[in-house]
Amino acid sequence: MNKNELVSAVAERAGL
């Protein structure tokens, strides 16, 4: 998993 995937996953969890 790269950083972009991690950021995307966190953003989805945050409701962004």
UniProtKB/Swiss-Prot annotation:
Function: Histone-like DNA-binding protein which is capable of wrapping DNA to stabilize it, and thus to prevent its denaturation under extreme environmental conditions.
UniProt keywords, alphabetically: DNA condensation, DNA-binding
Entry similarity comment: Belongs to the bacterial histone-like protein family.
Protein name: DNA-binding protein H3-RL
Any one GO molecular-function label of the UniProt entry: DNA binding
UniProt lineage: Bacteria, Pseudomonadati, Pseudomonadota, Alphaproteobacteria, Hyphomicrobiales
Origin superkingdom: Bacteria
The organism of origin for this protein: Rhizobium leguminosarum
A single GO BP: chromosome condensation
